[in-house]
Each structure stands twice: as structure tokens, then as C-alpha cells.
Amino acid sequence: MASAAVANYEEEIVRPVADFSPSLWGDQFLSFSIKNQVAEKYAKEIEALKEQTRNMLLATGMKLADTLNLIDTIERLGISYHFEKEIDDILDQIYNQNSNCNDLCTSALQFRLLRQHGFNISPEIFSKFQDENGKFKESLASDVLGLLNLYEASHVRTHADDILEDALAFSTIHLESAAPHLKSPLREQVTHALEQCLHKGVPRVETRFFISSIYDKEQSKNNVLLRFAKLDFNLLQMLHKQELAQVSRWWKDLDFVTTLPYARDRVVECYFWALGVYFEPQYSQARVMLVKTISMISIVDDTFDAYGTVKELEAYTDAIQRWDINEIDRLPDYMKISYKAILDLYKDYEKELSSAGRSHIVCHAIERMKEVVRNYNVESTWFIEGYTPPVSEYLSNALATTTYYYLATTSYLGMKSATEQDFEWLSKNPKILEASVIICRVIDDTATYEVEKSRGQIATGIECCMRDYGISTKEAMAKFQNMAETAWKDINEGLLRPTPVSTEFLTPILNLARIVEVTYIHNLDGYTHPEKVLKPHIINLLVDSIKI
């Protein structure tokens, strides 16, 4: 929300500038070049390991439990993108055969994997583990692996899966009790899962943790899969570091740190977000476009949130709506800098996509950006007027200011297979997108409430909720948490087949929700204060390679 201007514009303008910390990274990521000999060596060995892994997947006569565990391991190791068709075919066969199993571990794993791949397997698979009163049998308390898989499965639940509400409560209680007494690496796996469930985690973060902290220490590990995963992670990391260097140079050339010192300098954290949306090599162009967009809208956000005056922000909003470089003279000098940079960026996007005949799709992202800025301006007006809207009015405006409609649309720009129809579907705010946006809004609002309150912002989500319902801060936060849980069920339903667009275009929407869960974990604002949350993830993904 925007900061207030003074009533009399003839007087010196007082700007209640937020005291954002500088970047943690300096010029650390400014230069990186892939060592071609190393990359070629890795790629050659990966091809051989890929063939061995494919043979494992396609081997006949495997038990159901072994097949499911192999798929789960491949996915957790971050190498499943090499075998999407093979894995989908195997799971399709398992689903259509209505394969059944009697142990909790296999049943729960089967349920989660099928649901995550869009197969609407019935939760009745768990009824055999309940007693005559409909409660999970206490005899399961000693089956830690079974409980762990049940816990992970409970997070893919939809609105109709009441049994999984019980599963979550039951597995959580018993895992918390068992964790201190477990041997390594199972202890670390259980502790980590209770902190961050797999389904809501950022895929690359979860992969790095699983490779280094779990699978590498397992006695029963498959060394082919482990080496494949390590080589593949390091090879991809080279590409990611090269992209980050490219983006860092672009950011340094813009020199916003000097010219717009009121704004957060978070280009590395923005790259982490883009990497969270998609990490695979085929999305390199998409990642670079997305990180530039996130970095730029962050500057605009801080302009509204922590610097601009009412008149300035109205002029800026109007200029963005007109989207015309000739409007620049109507803006104060500091706003001209970001305005020109934004228009230049979208010209670059159009030029970049023109070679593939796709420059026309850029207009979808531009329209979403205009929407964000209009809604930023509404929030700034509320702040000036001291207006606390009803929750419904607040959310109708604040969902767009999450930027998630905008970022989801932008995430499609560099995806070469995205068609006009995919953008049209997204423009109608389908339920799965709406759910991802709601998750971002309520989690962000909960994490940033105290800071915003201290800055005098009264039209916050939590404040609106408290006033609307006559409830306490704690109760309002619980209400927002319930909204997030409901939205996760909507996302999980939206992933089930048949889907209106391919899974490729649903995954970025899912991953945007995952990113906000990770960034704001424990009600911490990991974007504004990355040292609290994101720094160790960035080091693991973009600084330290995995020892081979």
C-alpha cells in the first residue's frame, strides 16, 4: 500500500521511506561462464545414466511398491523431467488397473503420486486402515514410513476428501512423537516434512535437500540414480548461474540501486522465484523474462508502497494505462526512470518473441500490469483517506496487487508452446489461478501485518478482517490460514483430469503458490528480509554445487 503525501504540495514533501536492507549478494553473481569441457563431460555421462534409468522404469515384473518407490525417488531426485511420458504411462496403467495394496506406505504413496499426476483416485483406499469408529487404527503408530507417506498424501486432498483431514491430524501427532527417536536419515526426513511438506515445497529446494541430506545417506540407495541426480543438478545449476549472471548485468546497467534508492534491491531473490516456477532447461528464456518482470514490478510496488505522493502516483498510474513514451514528461524525474525501463523491457520482449511469430502475446502481460498498477493506486488512496474497506472490497482489489495474475501470465510468455487459447483461458481467472492468488494474498498479509501496522497502514487484510468480523488479530490470522487451506484444495482439484489446458500450463500456477509458502514460512517476510529464509536456499541452489 502506498505511503501518504502531505496535504500542501507547496511545502516540502515528506516521504516516509521504508528502511529496506541492501542486497545480501553485492556483485557475487555478476559474472559466470560455463566450463564447456565439464558441461560436455557431465552431459555425456547423463545420457548413459538416463538410458539405464529408463530401463529401470520400463522393467517388467516389478511389484507395485517397487514401481511406486522408483517413481517417487526419481521425482524427488529432480530427474523426472527426463521421463515424463514413461512415468505418466506407468501411472495411467496403475490407475486403470485399480491396483490395490494392503500396507499403508504403498497405499499412501500410490494415492499421492496418482493425485499429483492428475488421476482422481478415491480416498477410500485409506478406509481399510480405519477402525469401526472411522478412526485410523492406533496400531499404525509404529509404522513411521507409512505415517510419513500418509502425511505427504494428506496435502493433495480436495474438498471431498474428509478422510484426509483425519489422516493429516493422525500422522502429524504420531510423527512429531516419533521424530526424536528415529535414526538418521529418516529422522531428518520426518523433521523436514513436518516443517515443509513435499507438495507445497519449491521443487528445486526439495530436490537439493533430498539428494544431499537423505538419499546420499540411505543404505539402500541406487548409485546409478544418485550419480545421475548429482550430475544433472550440477549441470542445470551451471545454466541457472549463467542466467542469473545475465540478469544481474541487466540489473546493474539499470542502476536502480543508485537512482531509486528507496526500493528493494532483490534481483537474486527474484531469480529464486523464477527458478521456483520452472527449473528445466527448456524454460531458460521464460525464466529470464519472468525474473526481469518480477524485479521491475518490485520497483513499482515500492514506489507505491514507500515513496510516491498521491499526485505522483495518480500521474504514474495514468501513464502506465496509456503505455506511451510521450507520457513520460508528465512524470517527476525519479518516476521517468522506471517508466522508461518498463516500456523498454516490453519492447525487448516483443523483439525477442518476434522471431517465433509470438510478439502479439506480449499484450496479455501488459494488460495484467496495467491492472496491478490501477489496484496499487486504489490502495494508496485508501491509505491517504484512512479508509478500512470491508474484507470483500479489500480482496477484490488486493488479489491483483499480489501480482500473481500478472506473473502467471508473464510465465507463459517464454513458454514456446503457449498459444493464444492458453492466454485466453488464463485471462478469465480460472479457479486454480484464483486459488494461487488467494494463497499469496493471505499468506503475505499474515506475514507482513505487524510491519505494515507499524508504518501506519490500516487497510491491511488482517485489519479489515478484524474490523469486519469483530475478532482479534489471532482469530483473523486463523481465518486467513483457513482461506489458504481452502485455496490449496481448489488447486488440487484444478490439477485433476480432465483439465482445460495441459499440465505444462498448470504447473507454473501451482509453483507460484509453493513459492509464497516457502518465502513466507513461519510468518516471516523472506523477500524483504531474505537473510531469514531465502539465503540458505539461494546458497544451495545457486552457490554451492553438489559434491560428486
Swiss-Prot record:
Belongs to the terpene synthase family. Catalyzes the cyclization of trans,trans-farnesyl diphosphate (FPP) to the bicyclic intermediate 5-epi-aristolochene, initial step in the conversion of FPP to the sesquiterpenoid antifungal phytoalexin capsidiol. Produces germacrene A as an enzyme-bound intermediate that is not released by the enzyme, but is further cyclized to produce the bicyclic 5-epi-aristolochene. Mediates, at low levels, the formation of 4-epi-eremophilene and premnaspirodiene from trans,trans-farnesyl diphosphate. Induction: By fungal elicitor. Monomer. Disulfide bonds: none annotated. Mg(2+) 3 binds at residues 444-445, 448, 452. (2E,6E)-farnesyl diphosphate binds at residues 264, 301, 305, 441, 444. The Asp-Asp-Xaa-Xaa-Asp/Glu (DDXXD/E) motif is important for the catalytic activity, presumably through binding to Mg(2+). SUPFAM superfamilies: Terpenoid cyclases/Protein prenyltransferases, Terpenoid synthases. Changing residue 372 to I: Relaxed product specificity leading to equal amounts production of 5-epi-aristolochene, 4-epi-eremophilene and premnaspirodiene with cis,trans-farnesyl diphosphate as substrate. Its cofactor is Mg(2+). GO terms for cellular component: cytoplasm. It catalyses: (2E,6E)-farnesyl diphosphate = (+)-5-epi-aristolochene + diphosphate; (2Z,6E)-farnesyl diphosphate = (+)-2-epi-prezizaene + diphosphate; (2Z,6E)-farnesyl diphosphate = (-)-alpha-cedrene + diphosphate; (2Z,6E)-farnesyl diphosphate = (-)-beta-curcumene + diphosphate. It comes from Nicotiana tabacum. Mg(2+) 1 binds at residues 301, 305. This is 5-epi-aristolochene synthase. Keywords: Cytoplasm, Lyase, Magnesium, Metal-binding. It is found in: Cytoplasm. The keyword DNA damage does not apply. PubMed:1438319 indicates the presence of at least two genes coding for the same protein. Inhibited activity toward farnesyl diphosphate (FPP) by anilinogeranyl diphosphate (AGPP); AGPP undergoes a cyclization event leading to the formation of a novel macrocyclic paracyclophane alkaloid. Repressed by sesquilavandulyl diphosphate (SPP) via the induction of self-alkyation. Pathway: Secondary metabolite biosynthesis; terpenoid biosynthesis. It is an enzyme of class 4 (lyase). InterPro entries: Isoprenoid_synthase_dom_sf, Terpene_cyclase_plant_C1, Terpene_synth_N, Terpene_synth_N_sf, Terpene_synthase-like, Terpene_synthase_metal-bd, Terpenoid_cyclase/PrenylTrfase. Binds 3 Mg(2+) ions per subunit.
